[in-house]
Curated annotation (Swiss-Prot):
This is 1-deoxy-D-xylulose 5-phosphate reductoisomerase. SUPFAM superfamilies: 1-deoxy-D-xylulose-5-phosphate reductoisomerase, C-terminal domain, Glyceraldehyde-3-phosphate dehydrogenase-like, C-terminal domain, NAD(P)-binding Rossmann-fold domains. 1-deoxy-D-xylulose 5-phosphate binds at K128, S152, E153, S177, H200, S213, N218, K219, E222. The keyword NADP applies. It catalyses: 2-C-methyl-D-erythritol 4-phosphate + NADP(+) = 1-deoxy-D-xylulose 5-phosphate + NADPH + H(+). Mn(2+) binds at D151, E153, E222. Belongs to the DXR family. One of its GO terms (molecular function) is 1-deoxy-D-xylulose-5-phosphate reductoisomerase activity.
């Protein structure tokens, strides 16, 4: 992975933080504040739901170059130069930055991702959905090495891949904690509540990422992301369960050796590495204490109980807009679950239903989406189809779930 960014004349890297009020964004600002000799904030962007947090960030950083997607929140904040549905994209286009951290949630991050790549800035990508949805569009817009992953698994893979040449790679191994329901059977999952799905055993994340981790949809998205970022075919990417979340991923080489990246679960490490790539940031996180007795476990993923990863693999192998459809169907189904309209297993069942009906979005002559509108049209169709599936799944299930939770 090459490094197209050398920094501007002042020596510090200018960082534009998209999704600054979320879990990744707030931790990134802490990393930047702790390393004023390495980084400076040149802009902030947020949806507007956590306005108090954004106002505190504005005061702490002194940054006035801010975008808020919600017009009402922007009006309440006052003196916001960019607001409205296209505010974040305009902020990216008009801000001189060395690094754009995209920590937005969901496929709405696609246009800002493309805008960041077009500016030539390094893209520190936490918004995996934009890569999953945009696929070949995003890759075509990127210079070699311009996209640096923030996800701990892909950050780990990028580090491990330094240990060999591309033709020496046998397979990638993505690790998964297994989520809060590891070891449960399919029947147990029927009674899972949003509160239970909102607690992760090892990571502290935002609501949607935590839910996606519980359903293993997040690992499905990461499988697609690994294929796109590193160009390794799907049949050479494995997913294994590692409950301790210390080994973040591994690369096995053709000579039988495996290189792993290990560290206690702390997102500040991959965040800092993405901001400073290829240089590391000293003291970003604590290291493993190897003199203290510990056990690291690895086990196969139960794909019968948690089929989300294999659905993602299937969508990725088909190509076209199928990965965008996987992502959009999940967003609708996950929201329906959080609202108590469907049961937990219906999230992945909805994705499967939508993919099964999506033949029209399969690739024509091996082609991917040609434009952003192609992606958005596919996702619009997927959301509509998902809502139909949710309505069907809701029959007889919502009342049972409400009774269980009352």
């Amino acid at each position: 992975m090459n490094n197209p960014i050398e920094g501007h004349a002042g020596g510090r890297l200018r960082v534009l933080v998209l999704g600054s009020t979320g879990s990744i964004g707030t931790q990134a600002l802490e990393v930047i504040a702790a390393n004023p000799d390495r980084f400076e904030v040149v802009g902030l962007a947020a949806g507007g739901a956590q306005l108090d947090t954004l106002l505190r960030q504005r005061a702490a950083t002194g940054v006035t170059n801010i975008a808020i997607a919600d017009d009402r929140a922007a009006q309440l904040a006052g003196d916001i130069p960019y607001h409205g549905t296209d505010a974040v994209t305009r902020l990216v286009e008009e801000t001189e930055a060395d690094v754009v951290l995209n920590a937005l949630v969901g496929a709405l991050g696609l246009r800002p991702t493309l805008a960041a790549l077009h500016t030539g800035a390094r893209l520190a990508l936490a918004n995996k959905e934009s890569l999953v949805a945009g696929g070949s569009l995003v890759l075509a817009a990127a210079q070699p090495g311009q996209i640096v992953p923030v996800d701990s698994e892909h950050s780990a893979l990028a580090q491990c891949l330094r240990g060999g040449t591309p033709d020496e790679v046998a397979k990638l191994v993505l690790t998964a904690s297994g989520g809060p329901f590891r070891g449960w059977n399919a029947g147990d999952l029927e009674r899972v509540t949003p509160e239970q799905a909102g607690v992760h055993p090892t990571w502290s994340m935002g609501t949607m990422n935590t839910l996606n981790s519980a359903s293993l949809v997040n690992k499905g998205l990461e499988l697609i992301e690994a294929n796109l970022l590193f160009g390794i075919p799907y049949d050479r990417i494995e997913v294994v369960v590692h409950p301790q979340s210390i080994v973040h991923s591994m690369v096995t080489f053709i000579d039988g050796s495996t290189i792993a990246q290990a560290s206690p679960p702390d997102m500040k490490l991959p965040i800092s590495l993405a901001l400073g790539w290829p240089q590391r940031v000293g003291g970003a996180a604590r290291a493993c204490a190897f003199t203290t007795a510990s056990t690291w476990e690895f086990e196969p993923l139960d794909i019968d109980v948690f089929p989300a990863v294999e659905l993602a693999r299937h969508a990725g192998q088909i190509g076209g807009c199928m990965t965008a459809i996987y992502d959009a169907a999940n967003e609708e189904a996950a929201e329906a679950f959080l609202q108590g309209r469907i049961g937990f297993p219906a999230i992945v069942a909805t994705i499967a239903d939508v993919l099964q009906r999506a033949d029209q979005w399969a690739p024509q002559w091996g082609e991917g989406p040609a434009t952003v509108d192609d992606v958005l049209d596919a996702q619009r169709w997927a959301r509509e189809r998902a809502l139909c599936a949710v309505a069907t799944a809701s029959s007889g299930k919502v009342s049972d779930m409400v009774l269980e939770r009352s």
